[in-house]
Regions:
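N-terminal cap/leader regions of alpha/beta-hydrolase-fold enzymes
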Residues: 1-258, 266-267, 272
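C-terminal and inter-domain tail/linker signature
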Residues: 169, 205, 209-413
Length: 413
């Protein structure tokens, strides 16, 4: 939970409130969050809390304070009408000055560990993200579905830091005509990133909103955090953090230590069997009773490749074991067969800050069933242990399952 702080306006006209959220470590780079037209409501506070979980000192200023302090609106018809009325009356120049005051406020806070400050804005805040990039010394400014930016392109030459803009293809507030003006003007500027999300509408990143689109939201969030990390951090050794998590899963087999590497509400999904859990309680139960103490004693993981991004680790590996016990998460309900199994696997592991947020683990379940004798491969386009062997030895023949492969021998290329 965050707290409210009071900030002095740079023009001496008064003070305004801002919601402040701190990371678990108590310190981190500073980020100003630009509100939607609905004020510093529960959604914007949740955004600040999310950025705090990512490792930032996040500050959401009340940018309507000169009109009506403490605006906190929902999303019904009356609230929307009120929000539009406030947006039409706000002095955006003064709002940018307030953002500059917030940037300076963060720099002066002992919790902020980097002189560079970021800005992330949504809707009205998305427009202000562009203005913050052109009029302040913000190190990285990220705007989601800002409107009317096309009318401000003469300021583009003043951009000094990194600018990231997320556009929604179906956004009536920033339609194709507007984007046709914005994109050619900005795309070739240094440290400028422009992203278009097909098939989504304005406010696609508002969790729980009528236009919320989870895939677009996740992709945009990853790009936003990556841009912030490039300019102001924080930078964590995600590879080492993932290794520590796996060590507790398979070596120390310590449930508490495993859970300690994860966020407060983690999510694990073994995709072929839909096993895992959501949240501390369910996932702790899963790890304790169905995973950590339920794996064969000879289970090993052989790493093949690892890709480390801004927020996630993608691991390619081969798992080997003797099917000497029932493995609830991998072969639920299947008695031990005593067969030795080799499985090519892929893990997509996402982090928030220095804690693991989710795991998506993929493998070919048909290949596993072939190896333990529960699926006859004859006449089916499936492979058994050959899949793992081919992953480790590229010289093994390809296309053995393609009946028509021989027919193309000698044909033109």
């Amino acid at each position: 939970m965050g707290q409210y702080v009071s900030i002095a306006a740079s023009d001496g006209s008064g003070r305004f409130d801002a919601y402040l959220a701190l990371p678990a470590s108590g310190k981190g780079p500073g980020v100003v969050i630009g509100q939607e037209i609905f004020g510093v409501n529960a959604n914007m506070r949740a955004v600040a809390d999310l950025y705090a979980e990512e490792g930032y000192v996040a500050l959401v200023p009340d940018l309507f304070w000169r009109l009506q302090p403490g605006v906190d609106l929902g999303y019904d018809e009356a609230a929307f009408a009120k929000a539009i009325e406030l947006f039409q009356r706000i002095d955006l120049d003064a709002a940018v000055d307030d953002i500059a005051a917030c940037i300076e406020h963060l720099r002066q806070r002992e919790e902020v560990v980097h002189a560079g400050i970021g800005f992330v804005g949504f809707c009205m805040g998305g427009k202000l993200a562009y203005l913050a990039a052109t009029r302040t010394d913000v190190s990285c400014s990220v705007g989601y579905y800002g409107m009317d930016i096309e009318a401000l392109l003469d300021e583009a030459k003043q951009i000094k830091g990194r600018l990231v803009l997320h556009f929604a293809e179906q956004d009536a507030y920033c339609p194709q005509q507007a984007r046709d003006a914005i994109l050619p003007c900005l795309r070739n500027l240094p440290k400028t990133e422009l992203y278009l999300y097909p098939g989504v509408d304005h406010a696609f990143a508002r969790v729980g909103g009528m236009h919320f689109d989870r895939p677009a939201y996740l992709m945009a969030h990853e790009r936003s955090i990556a841009a912030l990390k490039r300019e102001i951090g924080p930078n964590f050794d995600l590879s080492a953090l993932w290794d520590e998590h796996v060590r507790h899963e398979f070596d120390t087999r310590d449930v508490a230590a495993t859970m300690a590497t994860m966020v407060a509400e983690p999510y694990v999904n073994h995709v072929p069997t839909l096993t895992g859990g959501v949240g501390q309680r369910e996932l702790s139960r899963f790890y304790r009773h169905h995973f950590i103490h339920g794996n064969p004693p000879d289970m090993t993981l052989t790493p093949i490749s690892r890709t480390v991004g801004a927020l996630q680790v993608v691991d390619e590996f081969v798992m080997r074991f003797t099917h000497s016990c029932e493995i609830d998460w991998l072969l639920p309900g299947v008695p031990p067969t005593g067969r030795f199994v080799e499985i090519p696997m892929l893990g997509v592991v996402r982090f928030r800050g220095d804690r693991l947020y989710h795991e998506h683990i993929y493998w070919d379940q048909a290949g596993v069933l072939v190896q333990i004798g529960l699926l006859e491969p004859q006449g089916l386009p499936v492979a058994g242990v050959e899949s793992a062997r081919k992953l480790l030895d590229e010289s093994l023949p390809s296309n053995r399952l393609m009946a028509r492969w021989a027919a193309s021998e000698g044909l033109g290329l």
